[in-house]
Amino acid sequence: MKKVNLIQKFQLFNEHWSPKVVGELNGQQVKLGKFKGPFIWHHHENEDEMFYVVKGSFTMELRDGNIELNEGDFLIVPKGVEHRPNAAEETWVMMFEPATTLNTGNVENELTKKELDII
């Protein structure tokens, strides 16, 4: 068992939209990501996702409206719900989701990360 400092982990990388794995439990992964600008519209067929804002704020765009998330807020996006994170400024986000979750869900493009770094 070891303690993890999220701030120190976030300081290890600069890329946006490139999640890093910082922990695993029961088939789930704890991931960190830096968001900036709009991501892509996508959904996940089999996985729910949790987004927790560590620093900054972002909008989770949904087809039926937007949800603003600020530091300290979290949101669970159920499987099958199309969504697009969009951050006006760099935002630090912790995600909790099954290890099988592909960051771009049902879409594969230049933002798709099939192999995630463990930090």
Can you annotate each of these PLM segments?
Residues 27-29, 36-38, 55-59, 66, ...:
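Short, charged/polar surface micro-motifs in flexible loops or helix N-caps
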Residues 60-61, 77, 82-88, 93-95:
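Short beta-strand His + acidic residue motifs that chelate non-heme Fe in jelly-roll/DSBH
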Residues 34-35, 44-62:
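Short, conserved beta-strand element in jelly-roll/cupin
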Residues 6-41, 47, 105:
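A short glycine-rich, His/Asp/Glu-containing loop-to-beta-strand
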Residues 2-10, 23, 88-119:
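Double-stranded beta-helix
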Residues 26, 54-55, 70-71, 89:
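A cytosolic small-molecule/anion-sensing beta-strand core signal
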Residues 63-79:
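Short acidic-glycine-tyrosine-enriched beta hairpin
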